[in-house]
Design a protein with these regions (language model features):
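Membrane-anchoring hydrophobic helices of lipid-metabolizing enzymes
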Residues: 1-70
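Pre-Walker A (Motif I) flank of P-loop NTPase domains
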Residues: 66-74, 140-146
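Structural alpha-helical scaffold elements that stabilize or flank donor/cofactor-binding regions
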Residues: 63, 108-109, 170
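Catalytic core of membrane glycerolipid acyltransferases/transacylases, capturing the structured
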Residues: 21-39, 51-53, 69-122
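Residue-level "edge-of-site" marker
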Residues: 63-64, 122, 184
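Active-site phosphate/pyrophosphate- and oxyanion-stabilizing loops and adjacent acidic/basic residues
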Residues: 48, 82, 168-169
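Non-catalytic C-terminal accessory region of glycerolipid acyltransferases
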Residues: 126-243
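Generic preference for hydrophobic
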Residues: 60, 71, 93-94, 203-205
Length: 243
């Protein structure tokens, strides 16, 4: 039954995505925020499909305050890349440059001035990251970054996917408050997984980390905050499944 429901969702999801991409093409001539509205609609429709076809529900704990800030989120699922269209204010995602090469999707990312990172460029990539993020801050946008740089499986230790220097470079250069985010989305929608499992996905906004910390202390607090809260959410899901 799970396989059938997953197949139905995957078909509906890709159809929904393609429909929005094509319907949104004329908006490339409009202002950037029009594309943001398409992203929010994409996320809402996907959540509706997940609930109706798979039995996956979303719970959000806390919220982001308005204004420019860094948002450092755990990354376990493709779903994470659309949720912040709903949860952040005028989101600017930090994403790998290769995504801009995806037909149509890449045009949307460029039009929204997402922050693209060439992971092969070394120090020059960090400089560009800081410059682009500084421009986003000047527009009052909320910058969402996945500090481990990739999707990680639930339960994986942070040492298997270390926290990358990009978030520390942004914190040091921009001196912005950082909101850590824990989540357990990989339990229901894992990386490159055809199967989607019913359950409750929780996204939790954690206490803000102040801007004035030194790099080492900032990274320690960020990793400790995200990892401990994510482990707690995964335990909660396991307890709920057994009850």
């Amino acid at each position: 039954m799970i396989l059938l429901r997953s197949a139905l969702f995957n078909i509906a999801f890709f159809g929904w995505t393609i429909l929005l991409l094509l319907a949104g093409l004329p908006l490339l001539l409009a202002q950037r925020r029009a594309i943001h509205a398409i992203g929010a609609l994409w996320a809402r429709g996907t959540l509706l499909l997940l609930r109706a076809l798979v039995g996956i529900r979303l719970e959000v704990r806390g919220a982001l305050a308005p204004g420019a800030r860094l948002v450092a989120a755990k990354h376990q699922s493709a779903l994470d890349t659309m949720l912040f269209y709903l949860l952040a204010h005028d989101v600017a995602y930090v994403m790998k440059q290769e995504l801009a090469a995806i037909p149509i999707y890449g045009l949307f990312a460029l039009h929204q001035r997402m922050i693209l990172v060439d992971r092969k460029a070394g120090a020059s990539a960090l400089k560009k990251l800081v410059a682009d993020a500084s421009a986003a801050r000047g527009e009052g946008r909320q910058i969402v970054i996945f500090p481990q740089g990739t999707r990680t499986p639930p339960g994986a230790p942070a040492s298997a996917h270390p926290y990358q220097p990009g978030i520390a470079a942004l914190q040091h250069a921009l001196r912005m408050p950082t909101t850590p985010v824990a989540l357990n989305s990989g339990l229901c929608w894992g990386r490159r997984s055809f199967v989607k499992r019913p359950g409750r996905i929780v996204v939790e906004f954690l206490p803000e980390i102040p801007a004035a910390l030194q790099r080492a202390e900032f990274m320690r607090r960020l990793e400790e905050s995200i990892e401990s809260a994510t482990a707690r959410l995964e335990r909660e899901a396991g307890d709920a499944a057994r009850s």
